[in-house]
């Protein structure tokens, strides 16, 4: 299983949250990364959707030490069917593999994408999550 995970919100190392602290213990921070997408405010957390050229979301890339175990907890936290990347229509997020950019080039990583209606949500520009805003 691919051990790479792109995070862009609550799981960022700079965010004081129990899950970001847990992730720091279960993974190695590879570094900063970007994703071609759009970021929206979904209540107290962000939602990421696929974007087009020019749409950039800034985040971090992690290498999970035990991806299978970590994804059980992460999928539950993100509202994805436990232990699987499959989702039902009621779930807000889906875990999918996408290409992300790092300072050394592109790589494929797991990303949690928002599945809800973004037309009623506030877009987070310039694609950097700040929980204080």
Regions found by a protein language model. Give the residues of each.
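Glycine-aromatic micro-motifs
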Residues: 1-133
């Amino acid at each position: 299983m691919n051990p790479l995970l792109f995070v862009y919100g609550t799981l960022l190392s700079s965010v004081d949250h129990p899950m970001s602290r847990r992730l720091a213990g279960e993974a190695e921070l590879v570094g900063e990364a970007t994703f071609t997408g759009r970021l929206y405010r979904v209540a107290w957390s962000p939602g990421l959707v696929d974007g087009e050229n020019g749409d950039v979301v800034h985040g971090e890339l992690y290498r999970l030490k035990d991806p299978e175990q970590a994804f059980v907890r992460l999928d539950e936290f993100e509202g994805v069917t436990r232990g699987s990347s499959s989702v039902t229509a009621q779930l807000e997020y889906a875990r999918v593999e996408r290409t992300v950019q790092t300072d050394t080039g592109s790589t494929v990583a797991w990303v949690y994408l928002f599945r809800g209606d973004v037309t009623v949500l506030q877009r987070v520009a310039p694609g950097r999550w700040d929980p204080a805003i």
